[in-house]
Amino acid sequence: MKHIRNFSIIAHIDHGKSTLSDRLIQECGGLTDREMAAQVLDSMDIERERGITIKAQSVTLDYLANDGETYQLNFIDTPGHVDFSYEVSRSLAACEGALLVVDAGQGVEAQTLANCYTALEMDMDVVPVLNKIDLPQADPDRVAEEIEDIVGIEATDAVRCSAKTGVGIKDVLEVIVAQIPPPEGDPEGPLQALIIDSWFDSYLGVVSLVRIKNGVLKKGDKFKVMSTGQNYNADRVGIFTPKQTDTTELKTGEVGFVIAGIKEIHGAPVGDTLTHSKHGAEKALAGFKKVKPQVYAGLFPISTDDYENFRDALNKLSLNDASLFFEPETSSALGFGFRIGFLGLLHMEIIQERLEREYNLELITTAPTVVYEIVQTNGETIYVDNPSDLPAINNIAEMREPIVETNILVPKEYLGNVITLCIEKRGVQTNLVYHGNQVALTYELPMAEVVMDFFDRLKSTSRGYASLEYNFIRFEPADMVRLDILINGDRVDALAMIIHKGLIRSKGLALVNKMKELIPRQMFDIAVQAAVGSQIIARSSIKAMRKDVTAKCYGGDVSRKKKLLNKQKEGKKRMKQVGNVEVPQEAFLAVLKLND
């Protein structure tokens, strides 16, 4: 056991986590040069296209150290993006240490801090590594100082390497062996294995990634899942080298997979504990804290026949992604679908893309909303994540919106732009600290503003240099109202949104004008209105297409023309009463992109 090292790689987006993992795999001969592909561990197509890591992946490597001993390194490549921070905390729970990778050119960024604090809170040893030293703008000494200054861990002797060229990779491996402690646990004790991750394979059923804390799990053992009490047979156990490799047993301290032919999707939930059916452990391991979704949106299949497939797809995805929450929803405009909870907008995009790609579904999304706390006049408190569930205005005593604490790191030349943006988003500044060239800003912002387009705007005002991470702190009373869009006097539930009172006029007008462009003209006039309660605040009409009914009369009596025109008038009137207006898919998405 003293030859096992379990560690995670944590870093900000684009500081070279996945490339460093590739080099470590290559150095230890996990894959031959022929099988080596860039970003081996980013196995999803979306991950490769966007160049980001979404799912944490694990690898087991054997490394012959300078002291002549062979060490087993189990490491987990983690995502850097703020929406996936729960993936990071899950990966860290399986490790004793973490490599903190910092780009020697960019220096410390917000996610570096956030992930590092997560690791330190879990009492882990954090080993700093300066990556990308081959770049002309690299300045390792300054960055080492920044790490000590901002993060507060010793970094003068930090390993310097370049994952791209392979310089210093050997040193990284030596540091891992020297500075990360071996796992603790009792190999003789009853089995306790923590499920770190699981996914659904259509041939094998549920595949679970586990970390053995105590005891041994052998192939063929009977084990039970502690939360459900169900018993299963371990058909296959093994490790990823990154290829799936079967072994005969998983020993204390190891990380590997278990396949037990579990067919029901929630048979082995993430964060659960496995133990032997006979003489098992008494109590379960501390799991992970459940992450609460921050943003909700409605997703509807374009053809109603896909509803069942959509439900299956969501079930399978939620196994792999513990933070996904969903419940059925119906909309008069869009039919049957689901209300889904996400961690942020990137998470929402990724899930939608995975549903469309991996399960061949065509989906419509409604505008995302956050969860509001509402105190009704009868004293009852309710939580609303869907604008159409909002009670009538006269039943609401107080409405509270979620506030997040946002930590932003930005080079000082862009400080002004970022502060202007935060003020525009109704932010309150709580802290500002200078660290050399970087400024650490802390703002309290309404979550609704952060999830809409704050991230993109922040990147564009700071030329991509600012970085951010946020967490929910409390609900705060706010003047929020529901803005409805009426088309020919009918409310379209999928277009409703909850916004701040101060923005009603501008948002209402913008939305109405956008709808005017997007809804195709009909044979009759269409009125598009924005309303709050019963008060109309903006209106625009889509003019009817004109059909020239008098074209066939030339000369002749004027009463003949009048008769035809009146007949047309009657027809239009009738049409207007029964006519349905098709609202195209783009109109629903327009709500999201109003500020462009």
Swiss-Prot record:
Protein name: Elongation factor 4
Domain annotation tr-type G: ranges: 2-184
Top-rank lineage group of the source organism: Bacteria
Annotated gene: lepA
GO terms of molecular function: GTP binding; GTPase activity; guanosine tetraphosphate binding; ribosome binding; translation elongation factor activity
Function: Required for accurate and efficient protein synthesis under certain stress conditions. May act as a fidelity factor of the translation reaction, by catalyzing a one-codon backward translocation of tRNAs on improperly translocated ribosomes. Back-translocation proceeds from a post-translocation (POST) complex to a pre-translocation (PRE) complex, thus giving elongation factor G a second chance to translocate the tRNAs correctly. Binds to ribosomes in a GTP-dependent manner.
Stored CDD domains: EF4_II, EF4_III, LepA, lepA_C
GO cellular component terms attached to this protein's record: plasma membrane
